[in-house]
């Protein structure tokens, strides 16, 4: 029986090899690599049971990437469906409890049938010679490298010993890579911390400079505002002085003391000083206001009050008095004492 099986599988392999030159292998077109993995896993469990190493449920490239990132060994199993030793290897070796324990605890396990496009693609990369085929892959010298190949039927104890030997022989590379990676990470963290400290210092300096600029701008605006207020006050005083001079120039001549229609008025100013002047009965009270306004001692804004009876004289036009009355109409006598009330701050 054994010679017949050997002859059968040998002829089958020769036929498949020759067929490659006649037409392209349909397995070379990978369209659903994850589907290939899941399909193989289901067929494996249907044939050999659910007690097996944990399959990596992803593409070969993803398995390589994860093993590289996690710094773990990656065990690749390529299953030859038609090979005479595949069934015995899967049942007796790959699914042995001690083998399962070793694989699950110390490595990632990726497997696929070479009849699947994804498995066939990987077999073209690893170039196995026979089945069962196992390849141990790890990060070595910063690239994923095959560090061990197991081909042909193997017993559980030998499988464990050889896998352990391969891992022990190459463990130093992983340790070295871990140390280098930790050093790179520490360097990166240190650089990041330095960058963050630099950025924090830069932001603090920028904030200080911003506050300085704002303070300079605030002072500049304040000085400009003070200067504008000063100029405005100077213009106001100049305008006021010019207005006083105009009022003074427009005042009618003071009547003589002998004029029977003249009125002698004594003004008591807010600073307790007194001013005396004569006016004509026929003149408007506005003349009195203009006279007082032209005086240097007078406040800028004021009203004129009579004492008997106590009242405010309508010396400037208003809604009630559009045309202020004359001195006579206001009821003033030949001699009067009037009080100047300061209204500047009101």
From Swiss-Prot:
Keywords: Acetylation, Coiled coil, Cytoplasm, Endoplasmic reticulum, Lipid droplet, Unfolded protein response
GO MF annotations, alphabetized: lipase binding; lipase inhibitor activity; protein-macromolecule adaptor activity; ubiquitin binding; ubiquitin protein ligase binding
GO biological process assignments: ERAD pathway; lipid droplet organization; proteasome-mediated ubiquitin-dependent protein catabolic process; response to unfolded protein; retrograde protein transport, ER to cytosol; stress granule disassembly
Compartments where located: Cytoplasm; Lipid droplet; Endoplasmic reticulum
N6-acetyllysine, modified sites: 68
Pfam families on file: FAF1 (PF21021), UBX (PF00789)
GO cellular component, one term: VCP-NPL4-UFD1 AAA ATPase complex
Xref: PROSITE patterns: UBX
Span list, region Disordered: 200-262
Coiled-coil region list: 176-251
InterPro entries in the cross-refs: FAF1_2-like_UAS (IPR049483), Thioredoxin-like_sf (IPR036249), UAS (IPR006577), Ubiquitin-like_domsf (IPR029071), UBX_dom (IPR001012), UBX_domain-protein (IPR050730)
All residue ranges annotated as the UBX domain in the record: 258-340
Biased composition range(s): Basic and acidic residues: 204-249
Assembly behavior: Identified in a complex that contains SEL1L, OS9, FAF2/UBXD8, UBE2J1/UBC6E and AUP1. Interacts with YOD1. Interacts (via N-terminus) with UBQLN2 (via C-terminus). Interacts with PNPLA2 and UBAC2. Interacts with ZFAND2B; probably through VCP. Interacts with LMBR1L.
Task performed by this protein: Plays an important role in endoplasmic reticulum-associated degradation (ERAD) that mediates ubiquitin-dependent degradation of misfolded endoplasmic reticulum proteins. By controlling the steady-state expression of the IGF1R receptor, indirectly regulates the insulin-like growth factor receptor signaling pathway. Involved in inhibition of lipid droplet degradation by binding to phospholipase PNPL2 and inhibiting its activity by promoting dissociation of PNPL2 from its endogenous activator, ABHD5 which inhibits the rate of triacylglycerol hydrolysis.
Name recorded for this polypeptide: FAS-associated factor 2
Organism from which the protein derives: Rattus norvegicus (Rat)
Upper taxonomic lineage: Eukaryota, Metazoa, Chordata, Craniata, Vertebrata
Name of encoding gene: Faf2
């Amino acid at each position: 029986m054994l010679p017949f099986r050997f002859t059968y599988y040998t002829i089958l392999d020769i036929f498949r090899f020759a067929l490659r030159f006649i037409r392209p292998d349909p397995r070379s077109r990978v369209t659903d690599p994850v589907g290939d993995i899941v399909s193989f896993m289901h067929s494996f469990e249907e044939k050999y049971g659910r007690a097996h190493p944990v399959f990596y449920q992803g593409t070969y490239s993803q398995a390589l990437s994860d093993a590289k990132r996690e710094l773990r060994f990656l065990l690749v199993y390529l299953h030859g469906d038609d090979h005479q030793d595949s069934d015995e290897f899967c049942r007796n070796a790959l699914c042995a409890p001690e083998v399962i324990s070793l694989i699950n605890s110390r490595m990632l396990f990726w497997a696929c049938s070479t009849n699947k496009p994804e498995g066939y693609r990987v077999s073209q990369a690893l170039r196995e010679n026979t089945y069962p085929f196992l390849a141990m892959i790890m990060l070595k010298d910063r690239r994923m490298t095959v560090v061990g190949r197991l081909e042909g039927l193997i017993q559980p104890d030998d499988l464990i010993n050889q896998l352990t030997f391969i891992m022990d022989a190459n463990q130093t590379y992983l340790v070295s890579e871990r140390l280098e990676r930790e050093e790179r990470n520490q360097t990166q963290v240190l650089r990041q911390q330095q960058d963050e400290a630099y950025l924090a210092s830069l932001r603090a300096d920028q904030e200080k400079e911003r506050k300085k600029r704002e303070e300079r701008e605030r002072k500049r605006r304040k000085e400009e505002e003070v200067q504008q207020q000063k100029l405005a006050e100077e213009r106001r005083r100049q305008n006021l002085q010019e207005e006083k001079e105009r009022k003074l120039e427009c005042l009618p001549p003071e009547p003589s003391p002998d004029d029977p229609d003249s009125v002698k008025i004594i003004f008591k100013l807010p600073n307790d000083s007194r001013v005396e002047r004569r006016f004509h009965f026929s003149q408007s009270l506005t003349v009195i206001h203009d006279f007082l306004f032209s005086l240097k001692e007078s406040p800028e804004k004021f009203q004129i009050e009579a004492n008997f009876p106590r009242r405010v004289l309508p010396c400037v036009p208003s809604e009630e008095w559009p045309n202020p009355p004359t001195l006579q109409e206001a009821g003033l006598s030949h001699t009067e004492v009037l009080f100047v009330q300061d209204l500047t701050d009101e």
